[in-house]
Amino acid sequence: MVSINQNFKLPISMNSQPIQIQQQQFKQPQQQPQQKSNSCFSDQENYPANIQPSSSTSSSSSSSIHITKSMVIRPPLESNQPQPQQQQQQQQTLQQIHHQQVQLQQQQSLQMQQQQLQQQQQQQQQQQMPPPQSLPNKSNEPQEPIVVYETIRSGDSKRLKEYRQGEFLGKGGFAKCYLMTEVETNRIYAAKIIPKSTLQKTRARSKLKSEIKIHSSLSHENIVKFEHCFENEENVYILLELCNQKTVMDIHKKRKYLMEYETKYYVYQVIMAVQYLHNNNIIHRDLKLGNLFIDNMRIKLGDFGLSTKVEHGERKKTICGTPNYIAPEILDNSNGHSYEVDVWSIGIILYTLLIGKPPFETSDVKHTYQRIKQNQYSFPDEPIISHYGKSLIISILNPVPEQRPNLTQILEHDFFTYSPIPKYLPVSSLTTAPSQSTINQNMGRPLSEKTNIVNQQHLQLAGTTSPTKNNNHHYQQYQQQPQQQYNNNYQQSFSPKKQINNMNNNNNNNNNNNNNNNNNNNNNNNNLKQYNYSNNNINYNNNNNNINNQFANLSPNSQQKLSEVENDDFHYRKLRRLEKMKENDLKTQLLIKQQYTNMNENQQQQQQQQQQQQQQQQQQQRVNNNINNNGNTVTVTTGNNTVNVQIKELETKIANNHISDSPPVSSNNNYPQQIQKQQPNFNNEFYLGMPNNLVYISQYADFTNKYGLAYVLSNSYVGAYFNDSTKIVTLIESEIAYYMEHAKGTDGDGRRVLNVTQQHPHDTQKKVTLIKYFLNHFTNSDTTNLLINTGATSSSINNNNNNNVENVTNNNNNNSNNSSNINPIYVKKWIKFDNGIAFRLSDKTIQVNYLDKSRIIVSSKDMVTFVPYRGQIITGTLNYFKNGDKKISEKIKYIYGTLSNNLYSKKPESSFQQLPQQQYQQPQHYQQQTQQPQPQPQQQQLPQQLPQPQQSPAKQHQYQPNQIQYQQSIPQPQLINQ
């Protein structure tokens, strides 16, 4: 090939002639004499010797034709250049062109290889990605959630329940799984969606019905909970419990193999679930790592698509299962299969978790089946597993079903009994092996010590009660096979009611063993069990083993849950579960009474101190009882003697707590009257300090823009007055809360006792959650901590009231320990006005906080406590304040008039009721000019779920007894409704 210049043009005369004529003209110059050709060169020296242009076109073509040496095609005539040079030039030209073509081909091939590599990498990434993140088909994963409606029919009427289909979780052979949110309750499920197009065959429909029937009948802590199912025109929806930590298969992919203690932790829970299924005559037939879901680090067995219920004498012959986990008798199919196929699968799971891969796994399914039939597997050198682990795997993977151990024998094996099983595993173990310190902290005791199966001659308590007598009889008949030990363990099904009778018959023999179990499993509850409350008719002594009495004293709700106890297979689990239900029935009462144990001890100490000081106080009490105010002196009559005592000396004694010691705790609900009777110097016009046992609001925060008012009382209670007029109050570091919900047309406050650690109905649970947030807000505040912890040191403000936590009971039940008689003090109503905010407590105490940061507390009809911003606290009679400072007198008059009428009005309670403005100024008599307030602490930030409290100067301040001063919590001089 030759390269032709783009500007090359043929002569016009040549272009217009046919090709044959042009060829003839090309040959004619070769036949002309040499002389003529030489004459042509004389005229045009620039042309080569073998080219003779036409005379007619020479002038015109010379400017349009550009010929290079590489373009010229020479005829076979003699030339001046040697022939080898011409060939070399042509070869070089051809080589250049060939080299260019090769480069282009190489570039194209490289591009193709890069594209193929990218495609392979994308495919590998998609295969390695977990199911929730893998998106095999974008068309099946819409960006916006799909709305699904369920039609609910009630008689002739019907309504639609709305669900929102969310994230794709995974898929199986016939269904896909998505997140599904119920719009009405905002509850999230894992929805298994089966298209109706796959249910056209009768066999497919019957399998789905069987799965729904079996799964909906199950209830076990290690089985995925069946919630609900419905259908529409396109799909069938099965709503299941959502497990938040994927499956054991995901752990296997990330970690390959687990430690033995981790394997025991998971396999033990799998056995519990399978034992429950077998006792209900159900075979799972698809046990594998992908069907072992994890929720809060607990195993949940799922996917009952291949499960079947076995009737009396029936052996299934359907070939089904996952190739790596399928049992040899399913492949043989001559004699059918039964419960032993699940035992085989447990052995495969055990091997896979310890070794890192299934024992019979190959690249070809047929070869895998052949190895299963021939029982060809081995243990690799690494990872190293114990002799106990190998021994258990070998015994389970026995090709003869009848020679495999049953579930009870598996748990009795040395693999489970020679070393402890962890109580729980950390979440980090999903991706990495737990540290040794974490292992040591979470280790329990060996299974043999927990169950006493080995040490107590195998007590044969491993089974559970079957649903029906016929099914239970069949399950026992199935176990009557050649291996007698295998039969006996399965035949001994456990029924708690029968077991109670057996326990009573053998009570003398097993008394010590039962005591050991109770002691081992209830060490954390010894403090609770040392009480014996006659009202509950239950003895909590550790030596009590009368299970009949324990069962009889269970609440109806706990007796309904007895089936859950029947589904456990070990003696210690039954006793512990039964004991736990007892404790749950009485936990609220125990916690309430335990709150006041320390309080009662402190009361006894106070009484002893009072007895010691009684002799010293007798004379002073006689002085107070016979006091007669005469100007600046007090005349006291004792027999025939008259003693004149200066008021200043008496005030000094009172201020130094020589007289005003804490009185015994009252059992009367009328707090102000009891205070008046118990206070030694109440017959005086006034005294310095707070009244004993007075409960007042020490701090509060405003959340009324969404929720309500939160507050802290001086007795360490935290409460809330919600915008819907419901109230709740709880003691700091307590699990008990008192919820007041007034019912229309009824008397009383509708009080309920709640356990904040348990779940409640939606509306009540919202209030419990809020009080937890309020409690956290106050307890994390430095100011609040000072307010709460001053009881032991401040005699003039709290008087050790922290120990006297609402020890008020009904007069008619003074000696009763029933928790219903304990009446916590709480905010009954509150209103704001221009100069401050007023509260009415449930004990009829009225407290008013003013903008000038002073407080007035009316604890009874005649006793008033004035707390200035700076200065000494004064408690006196109403007459004393009426005859004193006019500004204070005007405030008290306003409290007894307008505020009292509004706080005690029978109209619907309104927290935003405005009152007329009361004009006044800060009384100068109680101001202290020399001292300044403490620096302001930073306001505690709340969680994002709650709004920040609006700041107000009416918030209470910490009083320091040795320094006549308050510590501000919020200094702003403008009140915002709190």
Curated annotation (Swiss-Prot):
Residues 696-780, 826-904 form the POLO box domain. Transmembrane segments: none annotated. Residues 19-66, 121-143, 463-554, 601-638, 798-819, 908-978 are annotated as: Disordered. It holds the Pfam family Pkinase. The active site is at residue 286. Its EC number is 2.7.11.1. One of its GO terms (molecular function) is ATP binding. ATP binds at residues 169-177, 192. Residues 497-555, 592-630 form a coiled coil. One of its GO terms (biological process) is mitotic cell cycle. PANTHER family: CELL CYCLE SERINE_THREONINE-PROTEIN KINASE CDC5_MSD2, SERINE/THREONINE-PROTEIN KINASE PLK. This is Probable serine/threonine-protein kinase PLK. It comes from Dictyostelium discoideum. The lineage of its organism: Eukaryota, Amoebozoa, Evosea, Eumycetozoa, Dictyostelia.
